[in-house]
Amino acid sequence: MIPFGSRLHAAIADRGPLCVGIDPHAGLLSDWGLGDDVAGLETFALEVVEAIAPYVSVVKPQSAFFERFGSRGIAVLERVIAQSRAAGALVLLDVKRGDIGSTSQAYADAYLDPTSPLASDAITVSPFLGFGSLDPIVETARTHGAGLFVLALTSNKEGPEVQHARVDGVAGGGTVAGLMLDHLRRLNAEASPLGSFGAVVGATIGSTDEDLAFNGPVLAPGFGAQGGTIADVRRLFGAAAAVLPSSSRDVLRLQDPDVMRDFVVRTNDELRS
Amino acid sequence: MIPFGSRLHAAIADRGPLCVGIDPHAGLLSDWGLGDDVAGLETFALEVVEAIAPYVSVVKPQSAFFERFGSRGIAVLERVIAQSRAAGALVLLDVKRGDIGSTSQAYADAYLDPTSPLASDAITVSPFLGFGSLDPIVETARTHGAGLFVLALTSNKEGPEVQHARVDGVAGGGTVAGLMLDHLRRLNAEASPLGSFGAVVGATIGSTDEDLAFNGPVLAPGFGAQGGTIADVRRLFGAAAAVLPSSSRDVLRLQDPDVMRDFVVRTNDELRS
């Protein structure tokens, strides 16, 4: 199995780095003239996939908006994942899971094992229980050539109380965010051209003293409508091995499939120029 | 709507504090002579619910073990939740979700809105994005009389690197775990007899300097087979307003419905004596 980092590196070279978030919240369904129900969810999500999945390297469905509708919403998510992959996009499922032991293993089985109905190329994970609590997910990712994006340094205003906290016993008084990047640097040390273990770092954090050279990809939410510019991405993430600027609203509000497609193709061109 | 804290207080008085985790991992399904598939999951989970939900105050299904089977596993989870509540147990769904803004709201809708197929009495949440990132979930819980259990001080060996990290600007150099307890103390300040906003604190942490008097319930995993004793629970959590010692393996390995029922009734008697 080709590692996720290698597949992502090739996909970015082929299609560009833009990651499109599929975030079917109630307001968007309403803007599209759809009901806030499973039928509306399905129409919305599959139309977006059909319009953009053949043109972008990474599609990022937000699981929460499917979980809202219980098992029937998850059945739609299964189709979103399968159809996105069939169209040649890598699927980064945004689930922010994290637990310990056999429960972490169960999440790995759910989202990274190719035999699962929700099998994705990569997922987001949350390290509040310590980075090592994610070990079963890391090992499963290695086995199946999948990737992870670990929450590290997000741009929401409430994040610093945890992510900037100082870790005992680290030289220089490192932060929680810095420690997560250190763990990722270790996991990616031998990888070439790109590691499979990424970090979530907000595109609108302004600036950071953290070392983003960890040989893995950065998922950078907040690009576009939420304020992050191409200049921000270049300035903030110059040291990173690869960056996926992630945008959702900018694309989804366009509604018309041709306009959505043109927008993602043009944005990828701008990001690569 | 009666607040979750009040409902939990009454349920503990009526049935005792034991929380039974429903953790149908592959090994347990095999021990029960069941297949590692949706049919095995359903048989296992519904037999456990039928045996113990009429006798315990809180049933805690672990979502990961249902997510493993995609939408069909989630359909089983919907039945587990509904049948547990119909039997008079409160359902604490262990999902450890956490996100920001409209995504946090979507998780709240998924698990705390009574119209959702997965509506539960309470859920576990993860504060890596900062406690305030959970605000939409807190507000939705208040609206619907639901509860939350926020990860704070877990007993897994990897937890301290995040949970013991020192928060800048807090007098005395408070920890991340302590800050989470402070946030909970604020949310529960006016509640009587018990707040609705709880913490997850491992039954096997040994000792702690954190102040557990935050007027909310403590979920204490690790009780029983994982090593936590009744003496540990009394010593560690003497200051807490209410404690839910949580056990899974001890109960589930018994298999026979009558034996499971007798075990949970006897354990509740011991915990109350």
Swiss-Prot record, chains A, B:
Keyword field: Decarboxylase, Lyase, Pyrimidine biosynthesis
Active site location: K96
GO BP terms, alphabetized: 'de novo' pyrimidine nucleobase biosynthetic process; 'de novo' UMP biosynthetic process
Pathway, per record: Pyrimidine metabolism; UMP biosynthesis via de novo pathway; UMP from orotate: step 2/2
CDD domains given in the database record: OMP_decarboxylase_like (cd04725)
GO molecular function, one term: orotidine-5'-phosphate decarboxylase activity
Reactions catalysed, as given in the entry: orotidine 5'-phosphate + H(+) = UMP + CO2
InterPro entries: Aldolase_TIM, OMPdecase_type-2, OMPdeCOase_dom, RibuloseP-bd_barrel
Gene3D superfamilies the UniProt entry points to: Aldolase class I (3.20.20.70)
Enzyme Commission identifier(s): 4.1.1.23
Top-level class of the enzyme under EC nomenclature: lyase
Family to which the UniProt record says this protein belongs: Belongs to the OMP decarboxylase family. Type 2 subfamily.
HAMAP family: OMPdecase_type2
Name the record gives this protein: Orotidine 5'-phosphate decarboxylase
Organism, as annotated: Nocardioides sp. (strain ATCC BAA-499 / JS614)
Lineage: Bacteria, Bacillati, Actinomycetota, Actinomycetes, Propionibacteriales
Gene of this entry: pyrF
